[in-house]
């Protein structure tokens, strides 16, 4: 079913302790009161630890009660180590990840009216990106949505040619 709608996209927030995300989101919503949902392109937090998660939760709580928030993973949402591991609070906070993992990849798709969002995790090791690409090709082929939007943390194309992610 087609109907007009709008959504808000924010990316690479990396809010610091005592940061301005809460005020920014309130102003953004005040200027876009009819937005159907909010999409975040990752990095809700600066560091994956309790203090930063607490700040992010406080910033999002009042919004989350009235507006759905979809978030893809950013590199700051991962614990640093030999193999990057997604901070547990991320998938507990954004529970749609728990039902939509493709192997070890954090991917999901959501349809809203005649638009379908395909959300990828561009932070994974290189070999995982191939399985995500295969997942995306299958989902795009099966989608009947008029509008198809792919969301990931890193740009597909960069003005620095060597930074292209396709």
List PLM regions with ranges.
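Short, solvent-exposed loop/turn elements at domain surfaces
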Residues: 16-20, 126-129, 158-159
